[in-house]
């Protein structure tokens, strides 16, 4: 197994209920606060607003609870245990159905509602502790179904097949992604980042030399080129760990804020270059950035790409851009957060290109994703000015800012299902 990919799927510890259908769209203000978290994570729900085989968080309130046994008075009680996977179906009909999935065993479990012939998944309950019950409510279409159970220290079990009559289309499932499906894309992505880090190291070297020479006008242009290169790497920041904090960290939460010695990297240099600091004040931060980038490049070949991150970051990159760049939060003087967002779009596109062969047959909303990327990018680049300058967010007119925010919010809705669709499953 190459050192650059990590196939192991972490065992979920917290409850999660997912549904492979899409009855409504989430509002922009919810998406702006939405945060995917690395598994395991309490109550993480996939969300989408597109029709077709995608994930949404239409969950009964009890399904969000992280502890206790939930009421099973309503709906079919589906048993999950080593001796009875998926037992308990009765009075099954097409249309909206509620299943109470109960773990009657002594070990943690998860259960999928699947098409037993194709393996397509319609719903999932994860982190199901012993003695607990979680509800699933979904639009059950006509066809054949079975529950598939994954219990700790037990082989995969598939329950009895149940036929639902009639001609109701219901929710459509999607084929689950496997670890093997994602190993190739992870290698391609690893190579993409390697090339990007080589470019970044050269650009940061130029920036450092310009600062040491006192050529601060040239350093400002070099800073922007290098920073955008880093932002185009997109998904990697989750893998970079502490290096990302050193290279692209904010002063938020530091005791001395902007003057704190722990405030390093691109934003520290940006602040100095655009707030009248002299070359001698910036020489130290520039040397530190150069050292950190070279260290990251040196260690990257041995770093792992978490397979879960490949799809996760397609949404999270631009979610972070909406929160920090399009609000102007991360403008430390250069006024280039719109350029940063455009670079984030490039990083998102790269991930989508790598994942495209896997997504095209699983996600019918993919054309809307590409259209959304094009729309947002076109709005951003109209704010580029001669000489490498950009309109700061604070200087945008109300109409243009609303257009950009709306385009970003819509795009996030289109991107939201991809993380769950590409999550490697057993």
Language-model-detected regions and their locations in the chain:
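Mature extracytoplasmic or organellar-lumen-exposed domains after removal of signal/transit peptides
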Residues: 170-426
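Secretory targeting and sorting signals
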Residues: 4, 38-71
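Asparagine-centered strand-capping/turn motif at beta-strand->loop junctions
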Residues: 101-105
